[in-house]
Regions:
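Sequence/structural signature of outer-membrane beta-barrel proteins
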Residues: 52-58, 82-84, 121, 182-189, ...
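Outer membrane beta-barrel transmembrane domains
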Residues: 279-280, 285-319, 323-327
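N-terminal periplasmic/intermembrane-space "pro-region" immediately following the signal or transit peptide
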Residues: 1-50, 101
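Detector for outer-membrane/organellar transmembrane beta-barrel domains
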Residues: 203-298
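Outer-membrane beta-barrel "beta-signal"
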Residues: 202, 339-357
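Outer membrane beta-barrel
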Residues: 32-183, 194-199, 203-212, 216-218, ...
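Short hydrophobic/aromatic beta-strand or adjacent loop that forms the aromatic wall/cage
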Residues: 97, 161-163, 197-199, 243-245, ...
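Solvent-exposed loop/turn segments connecting transmembrane beta-strands
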Residues: 60-63, 86-95, 156-159, 187-194, ...
Length: 357
């Protein structure tokens, strides 16, 4: 009798222990699921790839090549209602952006950003290549003055830098401002001189569809290589590097158009230019695309370049498109800057995804 009672008690205790463990497991599993759900609710994933075929005829030489231009992936994490973080990597090159935002105001009036990000110089530079009409993406002036790649003194920096930004929107989002304090050396690099670069940006939307933009930069560059455009600046030299731009963007159902005037000062050399780019929707996702772009890399040496683009693009699914363009330029850099007729036919496929729970 006592033995049966002991066995019964043992079974009861064992069942109680297993029941308790099972309950704890369910709670832990439930807690884990809640944590995963919370993380998933706070993270957005994005990515895109651009690549295609280019044919170029320049200086009596024909070149044709398949080209993968960009393969980017980035993640946004909304840590709290005021704190967010972004990480971006280009699998065809390097890590391009990583920064944290803290919104001080209850609305969008004041946000501080710290990390590596696109500088606010020019209208075009902060924009994604997935929204630009040209396969070459930005205008010659923007590419040169913002450090996107055509300025040998700065190198290929993709229009990005390390630093601090303060920005916000007021007046029912009609007015937007931005102030950047940057190293001035580009991505993934320490500052190579004692000075910081200051960039200011002001946008005003007086009416629906129209945006007026003015930007400027004051700073000092540190030359990483010699430049055929400015031969009196030597590698390792610190030099004055100032810029300013004024531009506009207009969007409507019948026409999308943006343009800008740009000017830069590197040491004693002035560069300046202007561009006008737009597209006309033809229906069923097809747009007619055109652009005229003028830029003088060195006004003292008459290093002026004219560029024209004409083509079509087909948006076959949301932000996915196929582009076909003819490009004409009247100058080339091979063997030194010189004027010559250059023709190109470019075809590009763009695939993009955006995921948010």
């Amino acid at each position: 009798m006592k033995r049966k009672t002991c066995i019964s008690r043992t079974l009861a205790v064992t069942l109680a222990v297993f029941s308790s463990v099972a309950a704890m497991g369910q709670r832990e599993n439930s807690s884990g699921n809640d944590w995963l759900k919370d993380v998933a609710d706070r993270i957005q994933l994005h990515g895109y790839a651009q690549g295609g075929l280019n044919y170029t005829h320049c200086d009596a030489k024909d070149v044709n090549t398949f080209e993968l231009k960009r393969t980017l992936f980035w993640a946004n994490a909304q840590i709290t209602d005021r704190v967010s973080f972004l990480f971006m990597h280009d699998f065809s090159s390097v890590v391009q952006e990583y920064y944290m935002d803290y919104r001080f105001s209850k609305n969008k009036a004041l946000t501080v950003r710290l990390g590596q990000f696109k500088n606010g110089l020019s209208y075009e530079n902060p924009l994604s290549p997935t929204s630009m009409e040209a396969i070459d993406v930005y205008s010659e002036g923007v590419t040169y003055l913002t450090g996107c790649g055509s300025d040998p003194l700065l190198g290929v920096q993709y229009g990005r830098d390390l630093g601090l930004a303060v920005f916000g929107e007021t007046n029912d989002q009609k007015l937007r401002y931005e102030i950047d304090v940057m190293n001035g050396q580009g991505i993934n690099r320490k500052d190579q001189n004692a000075e910081k670069d200051f960039i200011g940006r002001l946008e005003y939307r007086p009416v629906k569809g129209l945006n007026l933009v003015a930007t400027g930069q004051i700073g000092r560059g540190h030359a990483v290589a010699a430049s055929p455009y400015i031969p009196d600046i030597t590698p390792g030299e610190n030099y004055k590097r100032n810029r300013w731009t004024v531009g506009f963007d207009y969007k409507s159902a019948a026409l999308n158009l943006h343009g800008e005037y740009l000017e830069g000062k590197d040491k004693n050399t002035t560069s300046r230019g202007a561009y006008l780019t737009g597209n006309v929707p033809l229906g069923k996702g097809v747009d007619l695309v055109g652009s005229y772009d003028y830029f003088n890399f060195n006004t003292d040496l008459d290093y002026d370049q004219h560029k024209a683009i004409f083509g079509v693009q087909w948006w076959f699914f949301k932000k996915n498109r196929f582009q076909l363009q003819y490009v004409y330029k009247n100058a080339a850099l091979a063997g030194g800057f010189h004027h010559t007729a250059c023709h190109a036919i470019m075809a590009q496929m763009q695939v993009r995804f955006d995921w948010a729970k």
